[in-house]
Protein backbone atom coordinates (compact mmCIF):
# COMPACT_ATOMS: atom_id res chain seq x y z
CA UNK A 1 0.00 0.00 0.00
CA UNK A 2 1.21 3.46 -0.90
CA UNK A 3 0.27 6.90 0.40
CA UNK A 4 -0.66 9.25 -2.44
CA UNK A 5 -2.72 12.30 -3.46
CA UNK A 6 -5.30 12.37 -6.27
CA UNK A 7 -7.83 14.69 -7.85
CA UNK A 8 -11.03 12.67 -8.15
CA UNK A 9 -14.39 13.49 -9.72
CA UNK A 10 -17.37 12.18 -7.73
CA UNK A 11 -19.68 10.32 -10.13
CA UNK A 12 -22.23 8.76 -7.75
CA UNK A 13 -23.96 9.97 -4.62
CA UNK A 14 -21.80 9.16 -1.55
CA UNK A 15 -23.19 6.26 0.52
CA UNK A 16 -22.96 6.32 4.30
CA UNK A 17 -23.17 3.31 6.63
CA UNK A 18 -22.55 2.79 10.34
CA UNK A 19 -20.62 0.19 12.31
CA UNK A 20 -20.94 -0.49 16.03
CA UNK A 21 -23.60 2.25 16.26
CA UNK A 22 -21.23 5.23 16.13
CA UNK A 23 -18.51 4.58 13.56
CA UNK A 24 -19.41 6.12 10.21
CA UNK A 25 -18.15 4.92 6.83
CA UNK A 26 -18.75 6.88 3.63
CA UNK A 27 -18.02 5.22 0.30
CA UNK A 28 -17.64 7.30 -2.85
CA UNK A 29 -17.40 6.15 -6.47
CA UNK A 30 -15.30 8.41 -8.60
CA UNK A 31 -13.06 8.74 -11.60
CA UNK A 32 -9.41 9.62 -11.86
CA UNK A 33 -8.53 11.23 -15.19
CA UNK A 34 -5.24 10.77 -17.04
CA UNK A 35 -4.12 12.14 -20.37
CA UNK A 36 -1.79 9.90 -22.37
CA UNK A 37 -0.87 10.41 -26.01
CA UNK A 38 -3.60 13.05 -26.35
CA UNK A 39 -6.25 10.58 -25.13
CA UNK A 40 -8.29 11.09 -21.98
CA UNK A 41 -8.33 7.95 -19.84
CA UNK A 42 -10.90 7.51 -17.07
CA UNK A 43 -9.87 5.23 -14.21
CA UNK A 44 -12.54 4.05 -11.73
CA UNK A 45 -11.77 4.81 -8.08
CA UNK A 46 -13.49 3.67 -4.88
CA UNK A 47 -12.91 6.01 -1.95
CA UNK A 48 -13.57 5.05 1.70
CA UNK A 49 -13.67 7.65 4.48
CA UNK A 50 -14.17 6.98 8.20
CA UNK A 51 -15.36 8.86 11.29
CA UNK A 52 -15.80 12.63 11.33
CA UNK A 53 -14.34 12.89 7.84
CA UNK A 54 -17.17 10.64 6.62
CA UNK A 55 -19.80 12.95 8.16
CA UNK A 56 -18.21 16.05 6.61
CA UNK A 57 -17.98 14.40 3.21
CA UNK A 58 -21.69 13.57 3.21
CA UNK A 59 -22.53 17.15 4.11
CA UNK A 60 -20.26 19.09 1.73
CA UNK A 61 -19.51 17.00 -1.38
CA UNK A 62 -21.91 15.93 -4.14
CA UNK A 63 -22.01 14.44 -7.64
CA UNK A 64 -19.73 16.20 -10.19
CA UNK A 65 -17.54 17.78 -7.50
CA UNK A 66 -13.77 17.46 -7.87
CA UNK A 67 -11.86 16.76 -4.65
CA UNK A 68 -8.22 16.33 -3.69
CA UNK A 69 -7.81 13.14 -1.67
CA UNK A 70 -4.84 11.94 0.36
CA UNK A 71 -4.79 8.34 1.48
CA UNK A 72 -3.52 4.80 1.13
CA UNK A 73 -3.92 3.18 -2.28
CA UNK A 74 -4.64 -0.46 -3.06
CA UNK A 75 -5.47 -2.31 -6.29
CA UNK A 76 -8.39 -4.74 -6.40
CA UNK A 77 -9.82 -7.00 -9.08
CA UNK A 78 -12.43 -5.22 -11.12
CA UNK A 79 -15.99 -5.70 -9.84
CA UNK A 80 -18.07 -4.12 -12.61
CA UNK A 81 -17.43 -3.29 -16.24
CA UNK A 82 -19.59 -0.16 -16.58
CA UNK A 83 -16.69 2.09 -17.54
CA UNK A 84 -15.76 3.18 -21.04
CA UNK A 85 -12.20 1.90 -21.08
CA UNK A 86 -11.71 -1.68 -19.87
CA UNK A 87 -9.38 -1.94 -16.89
CA UNK A 88 -8.76 -5.28 -15.20
CA UNK A 89 -8.05 -3.63 -11.84
CA UNK A 90 -9.59 -0.71 -10.02
CA UNK A 91 -8.14 1.60 -7.41
CA UNK A 92 -9.36 1.69 -3.82
CA UNK A 93 -8.29 4.60 -1.63
CA UNK A 94 -8.66 4.74 2.16
CA UNK A 95 -8.82 8.49 2.56
CA UNK A 96 -7.24 10.39 5.44
CA UNK A 97 -7.70 13.94 4.12
CA UNK A 98 -10.08 15.45 1.59
CA UNK A 99 -10.05 18.98 0.20
CA UNK A 100 -12.40 20.77 -2.22
CA UNK A 101 -10.96 21.43 -5.67
CA UNK A 102 -13.84 22.35 -7.99
CA UNK A 103 -17.25 22.17 -6.38
CA UNK A 104 -20.18 22.04 -8.76
CA UNK A 105 -22.64 22.35 -5.88
CA UNK A 106 -21.55 25.80 -4.68
CA UNK A 107 -23.86 28.56 -5.87
CA UNK A 108 -22.30 32.01 -5.93
CA UNK A 109 -24.80 34.76 -5.23
CA UNK A 110 -24.52 38.45 -5.96
CA UNK A 111 -24.51 40.68 -2.89
CA UNK A 112 -26.98 43.55 -2.90
CA UNK A 113 -25.43 46.94 -2.27
Curated annotation (Swiss-Prot):
<dbReference type="GO" id="GO:0003677">
    <property type="term" value="F:DNA binding"/>
</dbReference>
<keyword id="KW-0150">Chloroplast</keyword>
<keyword id="KW-0934">Plastid</keyword>
<dbReference type="InterPro" id="IPR012340">
    <property type="entry name" value="NA-bd_OB-fold"/>
</dbReference>
<keyword id="KW-0238">DNA-binding</keyword>
<feature type="domain" description="SSB">
    <location>
        <begin position="1"/>
        <end position="101"/>
    </location>
</feature>
<dbReference type="GO" id="GO:0009507">
    <property type="term" value="C:chloroplast"/>
</dbReference>
<protein>
    <recommendedName>
        <fullName>Putative single-stranded DNA-binding protein ycf41</fullName>
    </recommendedName>
</protein>
Amino acid sequence: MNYASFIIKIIKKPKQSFFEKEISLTEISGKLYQIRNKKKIEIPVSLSLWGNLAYDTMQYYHINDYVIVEGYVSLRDKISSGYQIPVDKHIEVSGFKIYPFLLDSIQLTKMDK
